[in-house]
Design a protein with these regions (language model features):
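Single-stranded nucleic acid-binding surfaces, predominantly the OB-fold ssDNA-binding core
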Residues: 1-150
């Protein structure tokens, strides 16, 4: 697949304090939670990974308003003896702001890993669950669970 797309644009507020999550090639990566409002007024708490280079010496604090541009990434982690697929917003650009017009978007192009599973929720909504493989550089892929409806 030549035209691979994996982009996200999220605006929200930092929830809690960012923590150093890991280090790769001498570069620290921070984990934080971003509270992103839905149109309904509910809030999603989304995990974000960002490089110390994006902070440029500053530190983010609880309640800071941010807009993040980046990609959806996935990785496997053993938690309590079982493998789990974890999904994170990998920030490639951050801007501190106070605007929340709900510009949140994710665009993905990939390959379906298995046939979509059609089901009806307890509230009667018809949905399809699927797993999308999105390629990235150096032969890696992100496996992203998706739900479609409507």
């Amino acid at each position: 697949m030549e035209n691979v797309i994996n982009t996200l644009h999220l605006s929200g507020k930092v929830v809690g304090t960012p923590v150093v999550g890991h280090e790769a090639f001498g570069e620290k990566f921070y984990y934080l939670t971003l509270g992103v409002p839905r149109l309904s007024g509910a809030q999603d708490l989304l995990p974000v990974t960002l490089s110390e280079r994006l902070l440029d010496g500053a530190m983010l604090a609880d309640g800071d308003a941010l807009t993040i541009d980046g990609q959806v990434r996935s990785y496997n982690k053993i938690i309590e003896g079982a493998g789990r697929l974890l999904i994170t917003a990998f920030a490639q650009k951050i801007v501190e702001n106070d605007e929340h017009e709900n510009p949140n978007q994710i665009q993905l192009t990939g390959t379906l890993c298995k046939a979509p599973a059609y089901r009806t929720t307890p509230f009667g909504r018809e949905i399809a669950d699927m797993m999308l493989a999105v390629n990235r550089a150096y032969g890696k892929s992100d496996y992203i669970p998706c739900i479609t409806w409507g």
